[in-house]
Protein backbone atom coordinates (compact mmCIF):
# COMPACT_ATOMS: atom_id res chain seq x y z
CA UNK A 1 0.00 0.00 0.00
CA UNK A 2 1.31 3.42 -0.94
CA UNK A 3 1.58 6.43 1.34
CA UNK A 4 2.81 9.69 -0.17
CA UNK A 5 3.30 12.26 2.55
CA UNK A 6 3.23 16.05 2.37
CA UNK A 7 2.83 16.53 -1.37
CA UNK A 8 3.83 20.03 -2.44
CA UNK A 9 4.60 21.97 -5.59
CA UNK A 10 8.19 21.62 -6.73
CA UNK A 11 10.46 22.56 -9.58
CA UNK A 12 10.86 20.26 -12.57
CA UNK A 13 13.64 17.73 -11.96
CA UNK A 14 14.41 16.61 -15.50
CA UNK A 15 14.88 18.31 -18.85
CA UNK A 16 11.68 16.67 -20.08
CA UNK A 17 9.71 18.01 -17.10
CA UNK A 18 11.17 21.45 -17.69
CA UNK A 19 10.06 21.37 -21.34
CA UNK A 20 6.55 20.28 -20.33
CA UNK A 21 6.43 23.12 -17.83
CA UNK A 22 7.47 25.66 -20.47
CA UNK A 23 5.14 24.29 -23.13
CA UNK A 24 2.02 23.42 -21.08
CA UNK A 25 2.51 25.26 -17.77
CA UNK A 26 2.56 21.97 -15.84
CA UNK A 27 2.67 22.20 -12.04
CA UNK A 28 4.85 19.44 -10.59
CA UNK A 29 3.89 17.81 -7.31
CA UNK A 30 6.35 15.87 -5.16
CA UNK A 31 6.04 13.99 -1.87
CA UNK A 32 8.39 14.77 1.01
CA UNK A 33 10.65 11.91 -0.09
CA UNK A 34 10.89 13.32 -3.63
CA UNK A 35 8.44 11.04 -5.44
CA UNK A 36 6.67 12.57 -8.43
CA UNK A 37 2.89 12.47 -7.90
CA UNK A 38 2.15 11.98 -11.59
CA UNK A 39 4.58 9.07 -11.93
CA UNK A 40 3.40 7.41 -8.71
CA UNK A 41 -0.27 7.30 -9.74
CA UNK A 42 0.36 4.18 -11.84
CA UNK A 43 1.58 2.35 -8.71
CA UNK A 44 -1.77 2.61 -6.91
CA UNK A 45 -3.93 -0.51 -7.18
CA UNK A 46 -7.34 -0.12 -8.79
CA UNK A 47 -9.13 -2.16 -6.11
CA UNK A 48 -8.06 -0.11 -3.09
CA UNK A 49 -9.43 2.98 -1.38
CA UNK A 50 -7.35 6.14 -1.59
CA UNK A 51 -7.64 8.87 1.03
CA UNK A 52 -6.29 12.39 1.10
CA UNK A 53 -5.59 14.06 4.42
CA UNK A 54 -4.29 17.52 5.31
CA UNK A 55 -1.39 18.52 7.54
CA UNK A 56 -3.58 18.34 10.65
CA UNK A 57 -4.71 14.83 9.66
CA UNK A 58 -8.24 15.69 8.53
CA UNK A 59 -9.50 13.38 5.79
CA UNK A 60 -10.68 15.55 2.89
CA UNK A 61 -11.13 13.04 0.05
CA UNK A 62 -12.03 9.34 -0.16
CA UNK A 63 -12.40 7.32 -3.34
CA UNK A 64 -10.95 4.68 -5.64
CA UNK A 65 -9.97 6.70 -8.71
CA UNK A 66 -6.51 8.09 -8.05
CA UNK A 67 -6.75 10.34 -11.12
CA UNK A 68 -9.48 12.33 -9.35
CA UNK A 69 -7.13 13.45 -6.59
CA UNK A 70 -5.54 16.91 -6.39
CA UNK A 71 -3.12 16.35 -3.50
CA UNK A 72 -1.42 19.73 -3.29
CA UNK A 73 -0.38 20.45 0.33
CA UNK A 74 -1.78 17.12 1.50
CA UNK A 75 -0.89 13.43 1.81
CA UNK A 76 -2.35 10.41 0.01
CA UNK A 77 -2.65 6.95 1.52
CA UNK A 78 -3.90 3.72 -0.02
CA UNK A 79 -5.84 1.27 2.16
CA UNK A 80 -7.58 -2.07 1.55
CA UNK A 81 -11.20 -1.95 0.41
CA UNK A 82 -12.70 -3.45 3.56
CA UNK A 83 -15.80 -2.53 5.56
CA UNK A 84 -13.92 -0.58 8.24
CA UNK A 85 -12.24 1.61 5.63
CA UNK A 86 -15.44 2.12 3.63
CA UNK A 87 -16.97 3.78 6.72
CA UNK A 88 -14.52 6.66 6.49
CA UNK A 89 -16.10 9.69 4.82
CA UNK A 90 -15.01 13.12 3.74
CA UNK A 91 -15.59 15.83 4.56
CA UNK A 92 -16.34 14.94 8.12
CA UNK A 93 -14.73 14.19 11.42
CA UNK A 94 -12.27 11.54 10.33
CA UNK A 95 -8.56 12.10 10.96
CA UNK A 96 -5.36 10.21 10.25
CA UNK A 97 -3.44 10.22 13.55
CA UNK A 98 -0.65 7.98 14.81
CA UNK A 99 -0.83 5.79 11.69
CA UNK A 100 -4.55 5.06 11.97
CA UNK A 101 -7.89 6.60 11.04
CA UNK A 102 -9.94 7.88 13.97
CA UNK A 103 -13.30 9.58 14.27
CA UNK A 104 -13.15 12.78 16.35
CA UNK A 105 -16.34 12.56 18.42
CA UNK A 106 -15.36 15.55 20.55
CA UNK A 107 -14.98 17.84 17.53
CA UNK A 108 -18.34 16.66 16.18
CA UNK A 109 -20.02 17.33 19.55
CA UNK A 110 -18.44 20.80 19.74
CA UNK A 111 -19.66 21.65 16.24
CA UNK A 112 -23.17 20.42 17.07
CA UNK A 113 -23.17 22.45 20.29
CA UNK A 114 -21.98 25.57 18.49
CA UNK A 115 -24.75 25.17 15.93
CA UNK A 116 -27.44 25.47 18.64
State where each predicted segment sits.
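Short, contiguous, helix-prone interaction/anchoring segments in small proteins
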Residues: 34-64
Amino acid sequence: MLHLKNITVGNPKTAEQYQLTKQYDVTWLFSEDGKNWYEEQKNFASDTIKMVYTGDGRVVWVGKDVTGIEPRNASVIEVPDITANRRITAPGYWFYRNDEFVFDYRLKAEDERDAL
